[in-house]
């Protein structure tokens, strides 16, 4: 079963935000961090096919302004009662018999049920508050250390302006049951008969605390000589203005060009993907476009010698099993472009990083860009999916899931519409059902799955994770292949 918290968030946002202005919170752990006036950074996406992520920086707007004072009060909107229930059952039976011969009969039933009842309300900052706030206060000097770091990396910074929160503690329960029975008889001199039955029940309960944020809206900060707040963010506007043009810095052979701060690793990746083609027309927004994007990235990996590939794979397998190592590696690569040489890391993250840098500590673009893309895809996936990818990498069974995910992405077009697809037996391998690796990989993406008659119910919200899963499988599989 997929994340119960994410399912609740998805249902609430569908009902209360038809304009698509709210950003869903993706984990219960981070749900308390998104509060009005809190500052967040927008982590650029490594692909056109999944959305950027927002990350709290543990600062409030008051931390970067002076004179020091509490934030103005927020407005509380009216409460909405949300109730969502699902109860479904599929059952069937079969009997095979011939006169005077063996008889075999069996039956099975599968049921799913869940229910959620909660009150949700909004907290928002009055738009007029920003004008008053910026008139009465100004940027703190010297600039806050965290802002200095974000400036050096060229990150865009936003402030949370509105949130949807739970009014009381909510318990979400989802149950999945399977039952089966069978009997047989073998006539003859000695009649042999037998029967059996069994059941399996899974129950997942998640408690969402009172005041948990389910979704939020943001405004963009623009920091120059003073602070401005853009209530309608402009994709072309940067929080920190780049240095004056004409500034040149030296480069070293095989290393990243030392570009002015503000040209982040992710922007270098996008430049690499487009290769002179306008961003809007780089790739079509369908499976063919996704496959073309992944192939563009993987071309660099095909040139690596087997020894380096093996070292990289061993490090990546370790990173997939260690969430802290994954975050440390992502952070190091993000800083590597704008801050110069990267600091060495320990453990599996360090093993991967050693494959991507020169002795000077500078990143090698031909190696770093594909890994940055891969990490961007991996961060879209859950910890459970990471562990399954590590196991598939170890057992060299990546191709089966890759073909299955690719087939589903191709069949489900257009991705913006719900649909139901049958699964060809040839793509399912030896097992399909609750707990099977392929089942769990898809279930964690937010898809509804059918077992007895294998099928998938496509949900538009699953697009980002499914595309990221395909990219992860394709790149890991490509690294694992022997050179042609």
From Swiss-Prot:
PTM-bearing positions, type Phosphoserine: 185
Q: Taxonomically, which superkingdom?
A: Eukaryota
What does the record say mutating residue 283 to A/R does? Constitutively active mutant; promotes activation of pyroptosis
List Phosphotyrosine occurrences by residue: 37, 158
Note the effect listed for residue 41 to A: Found in a patient with autism; uncertain significance; increased palmitoylation and pyroptosis
Could you tell me the Gene Ontology terms of the biological process aspect for this record?
Answer: defense response to bacterium; defense response to Gram-negative bacterium; defense response to Gram-positive bacterium; innate immune response; pore complex assembly; positive regulation of inflammatory response; positive regulation of interleukin-1 beta production; protein homooligomerization
The residues that cross the membrane are 91-97, 103-108, 180-186, 191-197
Q: Glycans attached where?
A: 338
> Which residues are reported to carry the modification S-(2-succinyl)cysteine?
56, 191, 268, 309, 467
Q: What is the effect of changing residue 235 to D?
A: Does not affect ability to induce pyroptosis
The record ties this protein, via Pfam families, to:
Gasdermin (PF04598), Gasdermin_C (PF17708)
Kindly provide the PTM information from the record: Cleavage at Asp-275 by CASP1 (mature and uncleaved precursor forms), CASP4, CASP5 or CASP8 relieves autoinhibition and is sufficient to initiate pyroptosis. Cleavage by CASP1 and CASP4 is not strictly dependent on the consensus cleavage site on GSDMD but depends on an exosite interface on CASP1 that recognizes and binds the Gasdermin-D, C-terminal (GSDMD-CT) part. Cleavage by CASP8 takes place following inactivation of MAP3K7/TAK1 by Yersinia toxin YopJ. Glycosylated: O-GlcNAcylation by OGT leads to reduced cleavage by CASP4 and decreased LPS-induced endothelial cell pyroptosis.
Lipid (S-palmitoyl cysteine) attached at which positions? 191
Q: Which InterPro entries match?
A: Gasdermin (IPR007677), Gasdermin_pore (IPR040460), Gasdermin_PUB (IPR041263)
Alphabetized GO MF terms: cardiolipin binding; phosphatidic acid binding; phosphatidylinositol-4,5-bisphosphate binding; phosphatidylinositol-4-phosphate binding; phosphatidylserine binding; wide pore channel activity
What the record says about family reads: Belongs to the gasdermin family.
Name the record gives this protein: Gasdermin-D
Upper lineage ranks? Answer: Eukaryota, Metazoa, Chordata, Craniata, Vertebrata
